[in-house]
Amino acid sequence: MLKTEHISFQYEDGKQALTDVSIDLEKGNIIGLIGANGSGKSTLFMQLLGINKPSDGTVYFEGKPLAYTKKALFALRKKVSIVFQDPDQQIFYSNVRDDVAFALRNLGVSETEVEARVTKVLDIVGAKDFQHKPVQYLSYGQKKRVAIAGALVLDTDWLLLDEPTAGLDPIGKKIMMEIIERLASQGKKILISSHDIDLIYEICDYVYMLKDGSVLTDGETSNVFLEKSNVEQAGLVQPWLIKLHQQAGYPLFKKEADFFAHTGKVTN
C-alpha cells in the first residue's frame, strides 16, 4: 500500500507546492496524475519516493507511516521506482544489459540471478532485439524501454512514469502503451504523470487532477473527464473521445479502437 494523507509541502524559498493532498495508489491499476505545469505533479512524485518530506501530513508505505531513515527509504525505493521523462537521466552504461543490471550488481546479487532477471525485464519491455547494442545507437523510444527495464529489475511493485510517451512517434507511443498495460496485467501498480490527455483517458482506470498543488477532483477516468468545468479549471482539455460523445452525440468509448470499430473505420 502506498498513499498520502493530507500532505502539504513548502520549498525553502517559501513556495507552497502541495496543499492537503491525499492520493491512494490502490484506487486503480493504472492511475493518471494530471494538471497544468506547476500544479504539483513532480513534487508529489518526490514525496512518494521519500526524497522530500512533507511539511504536514503523512506518506504511508505498506500500511505504516513512512520513516525517513536510511533503512526505511532503502526499503521504499526497492518497491517504488521512477522512470524520468528523459531516459538519458538514468542510463549510465554504454551497454544495455550492463545498465539494466547495475542496481542488482550494486546490491551484490549473484551473477546467475542478475542475468536471469535482466533477461526477464528486457523481454517484458520488448528490448531483447537490441540488448547488445551500444546505448548511443538506440532510438529515443528504445532508451525509454531500457530505463523502464532498469526500474523493473528490482521487482518493484509501484512504477512512477513521468511523461512516458513524450517525444515518441505514433508507433513508439503504441508500444509504450502496450508495455504499460502488460505491466498492469502482471500486477504492477502504475502512476502516470502526463500532459497527453488522450493517453491518460485511454489507459488509466483512475485519475487525480491537480490544480495549484491541491487535488481538484479524482475518480474513475471517464467520470473525471466528463466534468468539463473541472477540466477547464485545471487548465486542461477534454480527450477527443469525450468531446465526440458530448458534442457530436456518439456513444462514450474508452479506446480509440472501439470508436473506429463502431464507425466501421480501420485504424492501426
Swiss-Prot record:
Its EC number is 7.-.-.-. The keyword Translocase applies. InterPro entries: AAA+_ATPase (IPR003593), ABC_transporter-like_ATP-bd (IPR003439), ABC_transporter-like_CS (IPR017871), ABC_transpr_CbiO/EcfA_su (IPR015856), Co_trans_ATP-bd (IPR005876), ECF_ABC_transporter_ATP-bd (IPR050095), P-loop_NTPase (IPR027417). Keywords: ATP-binding, Cell membrane, Membrane, Nucleotide-binding, Translocase, Transport. Signal peptide: none annotated. GO terms for molecular function: ATP binding; ATP hydrolysis activity; ATPase-coupled transmembrane transporter activity. Gene3D superfamilies: P-loop containing nucleotide triphosphate hydrolases (3.40.50.300). GO terms for cellular component: ATP-binding cassette (ABC) transporter complex. It is a peripheral membrane protein. The keyword Translocase applies. This is Putative ABC transporter ATP-binding protein LMOf2365_1216. It comes from Listeria monocytogenes serotype 4b (strain F2365).
